[in-house]
């Protein structure tokens, strides 16, 4: 039987994962692992707003997917003692979709919009007066006889999450007084996250097993938890129920996640740049066509890790394979130097 591995290390949430993520999600700032500076800052902002009895200023959270932006929004709502209303940019198709959400907000509630960079222009424009003046303008009629009716809104907090800050229009981005960027996690932080999650799942875990899983989780908590789930399955069926280094190695080998945390799609991307396009530079659309994936998915999901780990470079002329990519795939670099298969 062939295991299909391509989706196991994507930091995007997979279908059916939301329920598990909610059960493992940190409940308070003290439970939240990593992003120390951001958590410390946001904790102060939330405490000050609560003491003054005011709504928190609007917050923009950016960074690669799977790093805990949604978890921070949930914690903020809990710390402020308000209700969190969750939606996403693609879900807000018409102004009416936004109006329904905004008019349902109680004082100081939080509206969380994931993938806020994907808002339609019409919805984005309607959001501006809501953020600044806490009003929503409704146009009645059409043409010369059209009239604008102003609907007053309760003072609320908008928390926007984005993986691509550059796609946000400047007028929208500038309306967020609080802007924080989440960064990839270190192995020690991911190990702590894995150990805590294993404890909640009732899974005994060895120190070296947790360390190995964390080392190969691409700096992303969501991936660490996903790999932990799969390792739990192998520990239960093919082991003694304990998460050991051997179980983690076996699990990731079956999922085709290599020793550096690269999966099959990562290797296909690097191979395409090197073998098909001579190492680059090559445009992202050409790479996407070569590997059979959408260019936006490559930019959001795969490239950040490959760039951060030194396998790929983004240049004004396109993507370029770096020496580490040649070495990892065992390819000869231009100039004749032999790579070594890692």
From Swiss-Prot:
Region (Small ATPAse domain (RuvB-S)): 186-256
Enzyme class, broadest EC rank: hydrolase
Biological processes annotated in GO: DNA recombination; DNA repair
One Pfam family cited in the UniProt record for this chain: RuvB_C
SUPFAM superfamilies: P-loop containing nucleoside triphosphate hydrolases, Winged helix' DNA-binding domain
Residues reported to bind DNA: 314, 319
One example GO MF annotation: ATP binding
CDD domains to which the protein is assigned, alphabetical: AAA
Family named by the database record: Belongs to the RuvB family.
Function noted in UniProt: The RuvA-RuvB-RuvC complex processes Holliday junction (HJ) DNA during genetic recombination and DNA repair, while the RuvA-RuvB complex plays an important role in the rescue of blocked DNA replication forks via replication fork reversal (RFR). RuvA specifically binds to HJ cruciform DNA, conferring on it an open structure. The RuvB hexamer acts as an ATP-dependent pump, pulling dsDNA into and through the RuvAB complex. RuvB forms 2 homohexamers on either side of HJ DNA bound by 1 or 2 RuvA tetramers; 4 subunits per hexamer contact DNA at a time.
NCBIfam families: PRK00080.1, ruvB
Assembly and oligomerization: Homohexamer. Forms an RuvA(8)-RuvB(12)-Holliday junction (HJ) complex. HJ DNA is sandwiched between 2 RuvA tetramers; dsDNA enters through RuvA and exits via RuvB. An RuvB hexamer assembles on each DNA strand where it exits the tetramer. Each RuvB hexamer is contacted by two RuvA subunits (via domain III) on 2 adjacent RuvB subunits; this complex drives branch migration. In the full resolvosome a probable DNA-RuvA(4)-RuvB(12)-RuvC(2) complex forms which resolves the HJ.
Annotated protein name in UniProt: Holliday junction branch migration complex subunit RuvB
Gene that specifies this protein: ruvB
